[in-house]
């Protein structure tokens, strides 16, 4: 039995149909005999909507209160996905970041994970349940809610995979893998079958937004192999891993933008 961590971004769970699509992907993975931990982002534009709500009240909100507010987005997502999984007959439990054991420093809105306490996740897995975890959030030494910054759910997924020694860490997005440039903006892009951590960081420095930088750095530190996949199209994605002797140089200068 393999342990698989799957992360789904906001576009993958933005509405009812997308939530059930994700639930089917997760349920099929579990029914294949795997233990599954799912990390979920806030739905669609929820985070931006919450930021706008704060701006309606004040133009200078405290970072602590912003974290309290923004954490609500992921909590909605995990509850809805757990409901969908249970509706499909796949027993699931949703956990907030702090219930899942994320402990962070005190840097509100851009916290860093200091340790993972995996007892609760492990307990749920032993009960043969899918564990649905809110990405992007944790708890600091003051027992205050903290968030990890934009793209923090990727980092949450990698941290869980590292702490649990997962067999796979799959990052589901709305694109089919890692390309040499954004296929939505640039002609003649090429999807990469595999790419090294350093090359992924190089692409990110050039503006690629497939993976959060901190998540790639964490994956490199703990040698967590990542697989970038589309939640909308079941085709092979891109593996992000440490360099091996048989890997060719995969990157070349990005093509010119579309007119």
Located regions from the model:
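A broadly conserved detector of short glycine/acidic/proline-rich loop/turn motifs that flank catalytic sites
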Residues: 136-137, 175, 230-232, 244
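Conserved small/polar residues in nucleotide/adenosyl-binding loops
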Residues: 252-259
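Terminal amphipathic helices with adjacent charged low-complexity linkers/tails
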Residues: 41, 233-236
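Conserved catalytic-core segments of large NTP-driven translation/proteostasis enzymes
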Residues: 190, 210, 235-251
